[in-house]
Curated annotation (Swiss-Prot):
It is found in: Nucleus; Cytoplasm. Residues 12-23, 258-268, 497-509 have a biased composition (Basic and acidic residues). GO terms for cellular component: cytoplasm; nucleus. InterPro entries: Velvet (IPR021740), Velvet_dom (IPR037525), Velvet_dom_sf (IPR038491). This is Developmental and secondary metabolism regulator veA.
């Protein structure tokens, strides 16, 4: 540190000049001017990470050097020889406090210098803003906060003997004997101190109180354009004192707003926000996914859309019509909530298709008669051909009367859904019947009068649609469209309990020796997943009889064990 400054501004603040007489009798005048004063700085501290967090003094100090030559007798006529003068110059910067500080008697020297960075600058001869020599200090930092000023010291290395001082006794570089060059310790060049200039006081702030950095000055830009290394900032980094949110950041509100706009632009939009307002369907059948991955395009209107309220607590969907291999299904949805099939479009049939179900509004009993289920006989070996479901008059409780030459018609099963997405029949060969458990009412047996089965069922093949409940196994590997048994089986979905578990088993067929007045339904082999033909072939036709109410009942022979 240089001499302690006084309370009054020093005489060499901002500008200072000094003159000397050379050996040739000429007068040289050196003039230093602080062209760009330091204004603010952020304290970088003295810890281990201080070097990584250094903030330079802003704006960077710039000192101008000019050299004039004149006659010692006439000082008014001076010639600027800054560019023509042959010598080496450098400027050394030191830091001193703007106010004198009274130290104690036992106060030791400072452990580390307060000024850090690059305190030495060489001269740069520039044409702008004017032809002169400039010293730039772009990397000066202060460790502690306070009020300081910079002091710049000019040193010169003389190259020509004619430019040496008149009364100087120091040898010139070209006058040093060559024999002495090999001896260590003998200087080969000498530096001459010329003058000192001081900057105006500036403030060093702590990290929390630092107001920020301003844009680069025009002088810094001009110097940088000529090849000097000066940091240029084209945006304002000043921070408002009342804004506590940006205390720990260097950019202000403008940069924060720009950052927020850029972050909002890359935010992923919420595509599912509007799906929360979608009204819920009247059925829970849509919650069950299909195992085949086909989703119909849209949903068929439910029963309230037709103005018809279904009286049953559980509503039954309508099965789809079978389609040919070369046609696209024209149905709208796999859901039907007990409504009539009047809006069900006619399916595409093979050549010469029979007429489809007539249009019109039907009662719920007619809707029951239109539902098809797995038929008996040799449906696994025949080619699946689509037949429309005939209208059957309803008798006694809404159960259809079974025809002698058609497939069975069953009453509706509660809480069921259908799956129109089926694979091609050629992909799955015919396999033996696999028993599958299904917690719903078994199909009402529809059997012809006692006679050989091959005469009635062998030549009649009807594709059937199997309706399963959400609590069931979802078809048990049965092709609902083609009428084929599939190799694989789908797992149970574990849904609601069936209608029989709640309201009893009165409508179920009597099997394994059961009687209507005996104990509840015992544990037995579940034939609901098998075809009627396989069941009758296993039990025998002689055990089938008609009840008094007109129902055909199959009775298992008594067990031999």
């Amino acid at each position: 540190m240089a001499n302690r400054p006084s309370l009054m501004p020093p005489h060499n603040e901002t500008e200072h000049s000094v003159s000397r007489i050379t050996r040739e009798g000429k007068q040289l005048t050196y003039k230093l001017s602080v062209m760009q004063q330091p204004e603010r700085a952020r304290a970088c501290g003295a810890g281990a990470k201080s070097s990584a967090d250094r903030r330079p003094v802003d704006p960077p100090p710039v000192v101008e050097l000019r050299i004039f030559e004149s006659d010692p007798a006439n000082d008014t006529q001076k010639t600027d020889i800054t560019f023509a003068y042959n010598a080496n110059f450098f400027l050394y910067a030191t830091l001193e406090t703007a106010r004198p500080i009274a130290h104690g008697r036992v106060g030791g020297p400072q452990s580390c210098p307060v000024l850090t960075g690059v305190p030495v600058a060489g001269v740069a001869y520039l044409d702008r803003p004017s032809q002169a020599g400039y010293f730039i200090f772009p990397d000066l930092s202060v460790r502690h906060e306070g009020r300081y000023r910079l002091s710049f010291h000019l040193y010169e290395e003389i190259k020509d003997a004619k430019d040496a001082d008149k009364d100087s006794t120091l040898p010139l570089p070209n006058q040093i004997p060559l024999s002495a060059t090999s001896k260590p310790g003998i200087p080969q060049a000498f530096l001459h101190f010329r003058l000192e200039v001081k900057s105006v006081p500036f403030t060093v702030y702590s990290a929390k109180k630092f107001p920020g950095l301003a844009t680069s000055t025009s002088l810094s830009r001009i110097i940088a354009e000529q090849g000097c290394r000066v940091r240029i900032r084209r945006d304002v980094r000043m921070r408002r004192r009342g804004d506590k949110r940006d205390e720990d950041y260097e950019f202000g509100e403008e940069r924060a707003a720009a950052y927020a706009r850029s972050s909002d632009r890359f935010t992923t939009p919420d595509r599912y926000a509007a799906s929360m307002d979608r009204p819920r369907s009247n059925s829970n059948g849509s919650n069950i996914e299909s195992p085949y991955g086909f989703v119909p395009p849209d949903r068929r209107p439910s029963a309230p859309d037709y103005g018809f309220q279904c009286p049953q607590p559980y509503q039954r969907p309508m099965p789809p019509a079978p389609m040919s291999h070369s046609q696209t299904p024209s149905y709208q949805s796999h859901l039907s909530f007990g409504s009539t099939p009047s809006h069900y479009p006619a399916p595409h049939m093979p050549p010469t298709p029979p007429p489809v179900a007539p249009q019109g509004i039907y009662s719920p009993q007619h809707a029951y008669a239109q539902i098809r289920h797995p038929s008996n006989g040799s449906e696994y070996e025949g080619t699946p051909i689509a037949y429309p479901a005939p209208q059957i008059p309803v008798e006694r409780g809404g159960y259809p009367k079974p025809p002698m030459s058609s497939y069975a018609m069953d009453p509706p099963k509660p809480n069921s859904y259908m799956d129109p997405r089926m694979p091609e029949p050629s992909l799955y060969p015919s396999t033996p019947n696999v028993p599958v458990s299904r917690p719903q009412t078994p199909n009402l047996p529809a059997m012809p009068p006692p006679k050989p089965l091959s005469n009635d069922y062998a030549n009649h093949v009807v594709p059937s649609v199997e309706c399963t409940s959400p609590g069931g196994s979802g078809g048990g590997g049965y092709d609902n469209v083609r009428g084929k048994r599939m190799v694989y089986q789908t797992g149970p979905t574990y849904g609601k309990r069936s209608h029989e578990d709640t309201f009893g088993l009165d409508d179920r067929s009597m099997q394994n020796g059961m009687r209507p007045d005996t104990e509840p339904y015992p544990a037995y082999r579940d034939f609901s997943g098998e075809s009627r033909a396989a069941l009758m072939a296993e039990m025998g036709i002689q055990l089938s009889y008609k009840r008094a109410n007109g129902k055909i009942v199959m009775k298992a022979p008594p067990s031999s064990t």
